[in-house]
Amino acid sequence: MTEPAPPSRRRLGWKAALVCAVLGGITLYFSLPTPERDIRQAIIVALRAELTPAMIDRALDDGDVDGAELLADAADLAGIGLPKPTADRLRAANSLWKQALGKTADCAKGAVMGTASGLAGIVCSVAADMTLLGDVRDATTELTKPLRGEEPDSLILGLAAAGIALEVAAPATGGSSMAAKGGTAVLKVAVKSRMIARRLADEIGGILSSAVHLGPVKAMSASDLADMPRASRTLGNAVDMKRLAPLAEAGTSLGRIYKKADGATALMVTRTARSLDDVKTAEKLAAIFGKRTGGVLKALGAKAFDLVVLALRLVWALLGLLIGALCWLVSALVALRGMIRLIRRLLRRSASLEQPA
């Protein structure tokens, strides 16, 4: 009867199997497409299929110069050339003096009033809303509406309270909550300027209705509102931070988009996103396309979010295939080694039986 293989030889066999598995895994890994490359390719293919110069002409016909600029930027990204008449119209609409006058007025309105009718205004408005003053101003505006026979907007009031609570929480969170505050500032300006998708606004409203207790807030008197420290304290204490977490998470993504790209891109996200999940997906788009993300969303709409999700699912599916292939490879190598050892034993036993006694 043959002796079993020594431990050193068995260890050598396992090492050989592991080396083969690692080499196979490396080969499969580098053959996998990266999410960024897949997302970029999918977006560009979709732009080439759906974006036409006529869309830019229609935007100019409607007086939407900002939208026409975004579409032209997306066309440039996809390598779509513009006919000379369209390019000339866009150039004329973007003449320096027209844009300077319009954007300066919109910026002033956004900074002072907190509302905006254009992309320049929202940038200035968000900058103003990044302070306690902006949130207290908006809360005061809403809380004094009943004196004018108007109904307060609970969405704006809730976002103002959330912004204050996130700023108050900044020291305890090491400043990380300020990114979420940036996102809530963008959302608040988008709501005031009617630049937010209805489904997204409804989801945000649902979260705020459970996270913000408006009873104590609505009970504030005029003197309370005039005292900024007291008003800030009352508004901040009205927020349940745990229930606000889903909005804060998406707000963080929106705040990062604002920093990585610009206010125009963040605005396009609020106008296009169907849910807070779409807002978080938009952060991946912004990481790849930067300031051109706004043009992608203007041209493709919510389809851009679906393309990102599809590309990520494909990568995860291929990763699962990789893990399965590695497991199969290791199992096959171990089984092959066992078969070889068995054959060797049988051959040795056969040879020993054939030897004369």
Language model features with spans:
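N-terminal Lys/Arg-rich, disordered targeting/topogenic segments
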Residues: 1-9
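Compositionally biased, low-complexity segments of secreted and virulence-associated proteins
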Residues: 10-13, 101-147, 161-162, 168, ...
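Hydrophobic membrane-insertion alpha-helices, especially the h-region
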Residues: 13-31
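Alpha-helical transmembrane signal-anchor/signal-peptide segments
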Residues: 32-53, 183-186
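Conserved small-residue packing positions in alpha-helical repeats and bundles
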Residues: 55-59
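Solenoid-repeat scaffolds in large eukaryotic assemblies
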Residues: 67-72
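Short, charge-rich amphipathic alpha-helical segments embedded
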Residues: 74-93
